[in-house]
UniProtKB/Swiss-Prot annotation:
Organism: Thermoplasma volcanium (strain ATCC 51530 / DSM 4299 / JCM 9571 / NBRC 15438 / GSS1)
Keyword RNA-binding set for record: no
Biological role stated in the UniProt entry: Catalyzes the isomerization of sedoheptulose 7-phosphate in D-glycero-D-manno-heptose 7-phosphate.
Protein name as it appears in the record: Probable phosphoheptose isomerase
The protein's enzyme class: isomerase
Binding site for Zn(2+): H67, E71, Q178, H186
Cellular location(s): Cytoplasm
Length: 196
């Protein structure tokens, strides 16, 4: 490959990156800040009533679940008490036992039966909105009397129809949806921190 071809390839890649950055910015701008503030207040009300936050998802969304919980049980933007939050994605023994003995489709709903109480706040994360185990988890959470939030992308999928609240990211690209989910999670944590 000649020098001119290398420069053309570098220019092409930089244009791809520029488009990617703009798509990410557009996705983050699709987040309704008033809705984020309401969700943060609702979670604070759950905490103040003795409830907890429970979060789950698959793959990158599982990582987002754990990140959300870490910001609350640990530290986000200021010193405050640890807040009661748990991710259903961290207990490998439970995940594999439930998947083996029952089905991966019920890996979250089964754990919710054990840990969720009426009034808890349950968040299911799925970039497609159609992960069967996330749908079933949110359905079970509602049956148990929990408040429910779907974090998704695209058109929202099934979880947006199941949950009481939904954050739907305006993108078709999984990685951009995931990045916007983390931005939304950080915004929610910022609202929560403002109450403590």
């Amino acid at each position: 490959m000649g020098r001119k071809d290398k420069y053309a390839l570098i220019h092409y890649k930089l244009m791809d990156l520029s488009d990617y950055i703009e798509a990410g910015n557009k996705a983050r701008r699709s987040i309704d800040l008033n809705h984020i503030e309401k969700i943060g207040r609702d979670i604070v009300n759950v905490f103040n009533s003795g409830g907890k936050l429970i979060v789950f998802g698959n793959g990158g969304s599982a990582a987002d679940s754990q990140h959300f919980v870490a910001e609350l049980s640990g530290h986000f933007s200021k010193e405050r008490k640890a807040l009661p939050a748990m991710a259903l994605t961290v207990n490998t023994s439970a995940l594999t036992a439930i998947s083996n003995d029952y089905s991966y489709d019920v890996v979250f709903s089964r754990q919710l039966e054990a840990f969720a109480k009426p009034g808890d706040y349950v968040v299911g994360i799925s970039t497609s909105g159609n992960s069967v185990n996330v749908v079933k988890g949110l359905e079970r959470a509602k049956e148990l009397g929990c408040k429910t939030l779907a974090m998704t992308g695209r058109s929202g999928g099934k979880i947006a129809k199941v949950a009481e609240e939904a954050i739907m990211i305006d993108s078709e690209v999984t990685s951009i949806i995931q990045e916007a989910h983390i931005a939304a999670i950080h915004m929610i944590c910022s609202v929560i921190d403002s109450y403590y």
